[in-house]
Curated annotation (Swiss-Prot):
Gene (UniProt): KCNS1
Membrane-traversing stretches: 218-239, 271-293, 305-322, 338-358, 374-395, 436-464
Functional description taken from the UniProt entry: Potassium channel regulatory subunit that modulate the delayed rectifier voltage-gated potassium channel activity of KCNB1 and KCNB2 by altering their kinetics, expression levels, and shifting the half-inactivation potential to more polarized values. While it does not form functional channels on its own, it can form functional heterotetrameric channels with KCNB1 and KCNB2. Each regulatory subunit has unique regulatory properties that can lead to extensive inhibition, significant changes in kinetics, and/or substantial shifts in the voltage dependencies of the inactivation process.
Family: Belongs to the potassium channel family. S (TC 1.A.1.2) subfamily. Kv9.1/KCNS1 sub-subfamily.
Main localization, broad class: membrane
Protein name: Delayed-rectifier potassium channel regulatory subunit KCNS1
Segments of skewed composition (Polar residues): 505-517
Residue segments, region Disordered: 493-526
InterPro entries named in the record: BTB/POZ_dom (IPR000210), Ion_trans_dom (IPR005821), K_chnl_volt-dep_Kv (IPR003968), K_chnl_volt-dep_Kv5/Kv9 (IPR003971), SKP1/BTB/POZ_sf (IPR011333), T1-type_BTB (IPR003131), VG_K_chnl (IPR028325), Volt_channel_dom_sf (IPR027359)
Stretches in topological domain Extracellular: 240-270, 323-337, 396-408, 429-435
Hydrolase recorded as keyword: no
One MF term in the entry's GO annotations: potassium channel regulator activity
């Protein structure tokens, strides 16, 4: 009897019975062979001209040795040229010795395309697989991009470059098209924070009332009041700019100066000032309530709409504190203190962005701008190059004429207006060369602006459809299911705990009964 020990594996009775290593997911097997393939004997464990039987995800095929020999660098080519069964097992997932069949737990659809590659030498792209899954399958089987057919190579490379940011395509990737799972997961994580918080259930309901207009009837009423206050604030700012109010404030300021008082506190109309105070009080209440009810303070300050709320009310309180600290003398010394109030009034216009909570179009526009920074950068680059070139040409052609083209920086305004096809007409060329330059500037602007705008418009359409689909899913969802989700976050009920205990006891009993010796099942081939 001959006994060998190779890499920790015991081989006994070399010419009669061989105990082979345990395959992946199976039992240790025994087989009878004529000779053992030693590393120095040069004897192969299977014939070199023997066909290779493979099973890929349930698809069984038989490949000829001649076809595999044409591509020795591929996985199946290396499997065909394997010098030992141990080496072959490293290249597959499992091996059926009775059928002499190699099993691969891979995509069966790609395997059919792989068979076509071994017949023709060209690999074609599968539309059923995304580019990344297709690339992973190709790398696993030992195929590179050079194996792609000429008809599919350009399309594959283009899709691979544009797939991570393909916001204008109707793909099925969760990150770009179907945000519902991600957004629902975010909501669940936020709601889970209330489980261990004090008065968590009450805070959670109030937070949902303020953040979700469709949550309940009080949330709809709160949303209507918030929109009304925002519109009233914007209307007050617009009314304040009317000439009659400006004249009234100017007269009040002159009277205050004549009386020896600071004119800063009497410039506002009393009605508009009261309306402004009411809006500020509501905005302050809204911001403070959201901050107190927010499940995460860090996430609250990272939300763009919350930052807009804070920036809108903060200048008012800073101006109020400065006025109280400086008094009348400070107001006279720092005459520009009123400009801070003007800045506050200007920043109030950003309150209109709060309407994005209730507008699908505004949310789609924000998402489009967020994911179109590359296109916007390209657009600005094109405009900068075009304005610089045509401004220099217009300056050269019109510098002798007194029409406003005195310097190249002065021509930048004309170039920007012309390239964007606005055409105010305040500065126009008068010479033939200047008019030709203006014609080129206008035509170039049409071409330059149109190219990125098309991509941005496609992205906006994509995000708009996605937001509409999400809103439809939220409207059609059962309110009782959402209540069940909220109840599940509070904790497991006593009935659920009792059921889990009974299930655990039954499982332990089943485990005790299953400890009896039995014949291990044979692995099944799919």
């Amino acid at each position: 009897m001959l006994m060998l020990l190779v890499r920790g594996t015991h081989y006994e009775n070399l010419r009669s019975k061989v105990v082979l290593p345990t395959p992946l997911g199976g039992r240790s097997t025994e087989t009878f062979v004529s000779e053992f393939p030693g590393p120095d004997t040069g004897i192969r464990w299977r014939r070199s001209d023997e066909a290779l039987r493979v099973n890929v995800g349930g698809v069984r095929r038989q490949l000829s040795a001649r076809a595999l020999a044409r591509f020795p660098g591929t996985r199946l080519g290396r499997l065909q040229a394997a010098a030992s069964e141990e080496q072959a097992r490293r290249l597959c997932d499992d091996y059926d010795e009775a059928a002499r069949e190699f099993y691969f737990d891979r995509h069966p659809g790609f395997f059919l395309s792989l068979l076509h590659f071994y017949r023709t030498g060209h690999l074609h792209v599968l539309d059923e697989l995304c580019v990344f899954a297709f690339g992973q399958e190709a790398d696993y089987w030992g195929l590179g991009e050079n194996a792609l057919a000429a008809c599919c190579r350009a399309r594959y490379l283009e899709r691979r470059l544009t797939q991570p940011h393909a916001w204008d395509e109707d793909s099925d990737t969760p990150s770009s098209v179907d945000p519902c799972p991600d957004e629902i997961s975010d909501v669940q994580r936020e709601l889970a924070r209330y489980g261990a918080a004090r008065c968590g259930r009450l805070r959670r309901r109030l937070w949902l009332t303020m953040e979700n207009p469709g949550y309940s009837l009080p949330s709809k009423l709160f949303s209507c009041v918030s929109i009304s206050v925002v519109l009233a604030s914007i209307a007050a700012m617009c009314i304040h700019s009317l000439p009659e109010y400006q004249a009234r404030e100017a007269a009040a300021a002159v009277a205050a100066v004549a009386a020896g008082r600071s004119p800063e506190g009497v410039r506002d109309d009393p009605v508009l000032r009261r309306l402004e105070y009411f809006c500020i009080a509501w905005f302050s209440f809204e911001v403070s309530s959201r901050l107190l009810l927010a499940p995460s303070t860090r996430n609250f300050f990272c939300h763009p709409l919350n930052l807009i709320d804070i920036v809108s009310v903060l200048p008012f309180y800073l101006t109020l504190l400065a006025g109280v600290a400086l008094g009348d003398q400070g107001g006279k010394e720092f005459g520009h203190l009123g400009k801070v109030v003007q800045v506050f009034r200007l920043m109030r216009i950003f309150r209109v962005l709060k309407l994005a909570r209730h507008s699908t179009g505004l949310r789609s526009l924000g998402a489009t701008l967020k994911h179109s920074y590359r296109e916007v950068g390209i657009l600005l680059l094109y405009l900068a190059v075009g304005v610089s070139v045509f401004s220099g040409v217009a300056y050269t052609a019109e510098k002798e004429e007194d029409v406003g083209f005195n310097t190249i920086p002065a021509c930048w305004w004309w170039g920007t207006v012309s390239m964007t096809t606005v055409g105010y007409g305040d500065v126009v060329p008068v010479t033939v060369a200047g008019k030709l330059a203006a014609s080129g500037c206008i035509l170039g602007g049409i071409l330059v602006v149109a190219l990125p705008i098309t991509i941005i418009f496609n992205k906006f359409s994509h995000f708009y459809r996605r937001q509409k689909a999400l809103e439809a899913a939220v409207r059609n969802s059962n309110h009782q299911e959402f209540e069940d989700l909220l109840s599940s976050i509070d904790g497991v009920s006593e009935a659920s705990l009792e059921t889990s205990r009974e299930t655990s006891q039954e499982g332990q009993s089943a485990d005790l009964e299953s400890q009896a010796p039995s014949e291990p099942p044979h692995p099944q081939m799919y």
